[in-house]
């Protein structure tokens, strides 16, 4: 089994940012190209009232993909809004002073090609958290026209 190596000279994190590096399990070149995708899900863990937590929150933001010059290695830069947007439904009539912590993510995070040969390198704000998902599709199917 081969593992990715951190050989490319990835940039250092800028002030107010952190760099997260992780490896993806090898799936085979053909499967990685045709069946797998990586979804980066940046967000923040926010403290809020129970009523606010029952509503749907999102953090505006963007994920930009960059390439290490001369290496072809990809890395990602995340920008997140400072404040979350929220629905405004009144849900609980109980004490609103009770606080809970909730992960609030960027809405509709994009999918990126799955590449296990290089590490996944992501730069994001110091107070942000990164979660990710692996999407796997089956065999391609063709729609029939009438």
Swiss-Prot record:
Q: Which PANTHER family match?
A: ECOTIN, PTHR35890
**Organism encoding this protein:** Leishmania infantum
Which parts form a coiled-coil structure per UniProt? Answer: none
**Which GO MF terms does the UniProt record name?**
serine-type endopeptidase inhibitor activity
Pfam families from the xrefs? Ecotin (PF03974)
Family affiliation: Belongs to the protease inhibitor I11 (ecotin) family.
Task: Please state what the protein is called.
Answer: Ecotin-like protein 1
Q: What Gene3D superfamilies does UniProt report for this protein, alphabetically? A: Ecotin (2.60.40.550)
